[in-house]
């Protein structure tokens, strides 16, 4: 994923808050939605942007999808920024 796409995903405060939540533990989409005052559809879109940027990954368990941080991408971004 291009750094530009990743930085675009990080630019949104709601997406950064989702990453903060996922820093603590993996969560289902429903659990993530409970922490915000926006619609489930809006959170779903934010999750899609984060996933496309490689910042999170998902895993289906039965009828639920759980999201977790992809720390490898975050570490790569930090290293790239240090060397600018």
For each predicted feature, which ranges?
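Conserved small/polar residues in nucleotide/adenosyl-binding loops
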Residues: 82-84
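N-terminal helix-turn-helix DNA-binding core of bacterial DNA-binding proteins
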Residues: 2-39, 61-73
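Alpha-helical residues within the helix-turn-helix
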Residues: 34, 45, 51-52
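Active-site phosphate/pyrophosphate-handling residues
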Residues: 17, 47-48
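Residues in the helix-turn-helix
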Residues: 42
